């Protein structure tokens, strides 16, 4: 049943983990461990979000759009934060000059 331990793959690792049960007369413990491992392996994979009960009794899922509306640090609402200290001391991205409005820095004689 058990492959020789010099073969590559999962069986070698399994043999190594079972070694502690074979040394001091723990054959029954080894059998129990093998049985529990087999039951874990036989388990059918189920998706984690299946719910068989009544859906209406579940609490409503949070709407992810509401999170953005409540988050003042969101980049969507960055334009609304004008009167904060960080904005007051921030580096200006546009400069108003005598000739008009210039993006970036002064451009010659504008």
UniProtKB/Swiss-Prot annotation:
Instruction: Give the top-rank taxon of the lineage listed in the UniProt record for this protein.
Output: Viruses
Q: Where is the composition biased (Polar residues)?
A: 48-57
Regions of compositional bias (Basic residues) in chain numbering: 10-23
Region Disordered, as annotated, extends over 1-72
Q: What is this protein called?
A: Uncharacterized protein DR8
Q: Which organism is it from?
A: Human herpesvirus 6A (strain Uganda-1102)
